Swiss-Prot record:
It is a single-pass membrane protein. This is Cytochrome c-type biogenesis protein CcmH. Belongs to the CcmH/CycL/Ccl2/NrfF family. One of its GO terms (molecular function) is metal ion binding. The keyword ATP-binding does not apply. Gene3D superfamilies: Cytochrome C biogenesis protein. The chain crosses the membrane at residues 105-125. Heme binds at residues 45, 48. Residues 1-20 form the signal peptide. It comes from the Bacteria. It holds the Pfam family CcmH. The lineage of its organism: Bacteria, Pseudomonadati, Pseudomonadota, Gammaproteobacteria, Pseudomonadales. Required for the biogenesis of c-type cytochromes. Possible subunit of a heme lyase.
Amino acid sequence: MKRFLATALLGLALCGVARAAIDTYEFASDAERERFRNLTQELRCPKCQNQDIADSNAPIAADLRKQIYGQLQQGKSDGEIVDYMVARYGDFVRYKPPVNERTWLLWFGPGALLLFGVLVIGVIVLRRRRTAAKVQTTLSAEEQARLANLLKNDK
């Protein structure tokens, strides 16, 4: 009975592997294959959070790979293919969105935050230095004499 259960579980486990889809495309040249690979790695899967369509197992990613392959076969340029995908799915489909009025915060926000942080730290350091300088006072003549006396007695 244990042997039967082990065999059944192994069979079920292998069913999932056998069902995994592997896309096979025929290319006329290695350059075309490289273009396909670059395009599928450059474009993000609309369904997946942070995965390109080359690595995604989502059904929409498989459809996008087929569309890219079809457009490559039609002789379209990389720019035309990317423009088609952006027109259909928006700038989200690109890993490197263009700099425009809608994406300026994405491009310049991190640098602005870093600059703001450096300014805040600089202001804090300057204020502490000024406060420390005000706290240091000179010793009166009586205090200096007492200090000198204490130092003499230590020797």
